[in-house]
Amino acid sequence: MGQASSQAASGEHSGVKPLGMLVAAVGVVYGDIGTSPLYTLKEVFSGSYGVQVNHDGVFGILALIFWSLVWVVSIKYVLFILRADNQGEGGIMALTALARRASASYPRLRSVLVILGLIGASLFYGDSMITPAISVLSAVEGLELAFSGLEHWVVPLALVVLVALFLIQKHGTDRIGKLFGPVMVAWFLVLGGLGINGILQHPEVLQALNPVWGVRFFIVHPGMGVAILGAVVLALTGAEALYADMGHFGRKPIARAWFALVLPALVLNYFGQGALLLENPEAARNPFYLLAPGWALIPLVVLATLATVIASQAVISGAFSLTRQAIQLGYIPRMHIQHTSSAEQGQIYIGAVNWSLMVGVILLVLGFESSGALASAYGVAVTGTMLITSILVAAVMLLLWKWPPVLAVPVLLGFLLVDGLFFAANVPKIFQGGAFPVLAGIVLFILMTTWKRGKELLVDRLDEGGLPLPIFISSIRVQPPHRVQGTAVFLTARPDAVPHALLHNLLHNQVLHEQVVLLTVVYEDIPRVPANRRFEVDSYGEGFFRVILHFGFTDEPDVPEALKLCHLDELDFSPMRTTYFLSRETVIASKLVGMARWREALFAFMLKNANGNLRFFKLPVNRVIELGTQVEM
């Protein structure tokens, strides 16, 4: 790791006190996993899995939950995966870029790893729909215990909360976001307090910390053992957020928050619920809320609703960040990205993603109507992403970090075995409602691979009739056209060929500018490119220059601002002397060798509706000329 990477990964954010960073991390990172106690044990003992609410059943499940939290979250994510940062950034797309770099010498392996990364990203979007739906539903369902006759109001109230959450996204959460940390700290303290109160009634429940109870559960219930992991995994939902949000807080604050507050609070609450079930098996209908005294029920519902809204906000923000990374890595069409904070570059809003998630969440709430029904569909996307993360990290450990196989392989096999068991336990959920996130993931995977392949084919088609730059410049020397004052910047994907916009301009206008710049924007497999590596400049003579701008997948691609770094006497990028020439291609599906006709038509539709270079690269509107061309694919 480089210095910048190490600082980010370690959480050395200048000007921010460690305690403040820890509280902020609790508010953003741990909302999802922190609201899991609302529905995990409720689902386990719902009757769907055949687990008896007795001494052995409660102890076995508690042992499985505790050791799953220890192995998957504490060991796998906190101790290992948080070290796999891409210059301080985490998440499935950052990890895919890292794995792509690690496997550069193995083209076939590289292709497989990229495909797996895209599948993981696609599943994340499916999870981004289920998390808000199940979290808010489970919180509002507490009203059923407080007031009789409110059962029919749960779904409408949940929809009101969720729709309001999506409506405020455009305005940003900069102001109220400062409350997320304190609210979630209060939530975890309440979780721990409720758990301690329950444990004091039946302290023998702490015996379930012994892993023997989990092993015994598998031995006594061999058929049920693997299947029950499909419910136990609900306690792990949100574990991927530890890695995805690492770029915001760094590794150390996330790890400290987990061990100092989050893990103890979760364990205490789960064991408190277990103690309640030992005393009153009928409490299995909603052990979380029934753990609280009657007078605290309404305040607890309010706090739980706030916590689930914060958890949902974190998932939605994660979807925005993932989309921006995927756009700049070339897997998703360009969309309008709106910044919602003048202070924080990472706080963004993408309308297309926001409204798509909202529609998906509304359909889930209307279709399943309860957190229990949704729990039967939850887990496929989560465990699939966790398994893919382990595979990608394995490639990074062995190929990039060069860990000795004798040390790395046993650890990786342990991760893959546990992740594989959780995933296998959740596969049957596909036929119990879990098809929704899977289908959403399949659709997104098709869109991403179609866009990526379509862009590659488009560049190849444009190259077929292209003119090599040296030949073109030689012809300019022989027959020099009329030159006009100023600088013309032509954006092109291939820096060694003449852009079509340049040929069209010369053909129709019979003039060239004094300085002609062929500009290529390249995105690296790293989050940020330092200013001293931002550009490359080559002079070809006759006033022609090739400029290559380098950006990371979290950088803001502001082309006019970046061109100011090109300090050359011959080049003048002053705003009133610079004109940008863009090409807009219209794709026509044909019988040429490439993609299937339906994928070509899909790509043409996406290209037509994608955000243009003008807005994406922040070009001045009054200094842009756009020329169109048709391309058969």
Swiss-Prot record:
> Which Gene Ontology cellular component terms are annotated?
plasma membrane
Keywords, alphabetical? Cell inner membrane, Cell membrane, Ion transport, Membrane, Potassium, Potassium transport, Symport, Transmembrane, Transmembrane helix, Transport
GO MF entries: potassium ion transmembrane transporter activity; symporter activity
Subcellular localization, per the record? Cell inner membrane
For membrane topology, the record states: Multi-pass membrane protein
Q: Which Pfam families match?
A: K_trans (PF02705), K_trans_C (PF22776)
Question: Which regions span the lipid bilayer?
Answer: 19-39, 61-81, 112-132, 148-168, 179-199, 217-237, 258-278, 290-310, 348-368, 380-400, 405-425, 430-450
Reaction equations catalysed: K(+)(in) + H(+)(in) = K(+)(out) + H(+)(out)
The family annotation for this protein states: Belongs to the HAK/KUP transporter (TC 2.A.72) family.
Q: What does this protein do?
A: Transport of potassium into the cell. Likely operates as a K(+):H(+) symporter.
Task: Kindly provide the name given to this protein in its UniProt entry.
Answer: Probable potassium transport system protein Kup
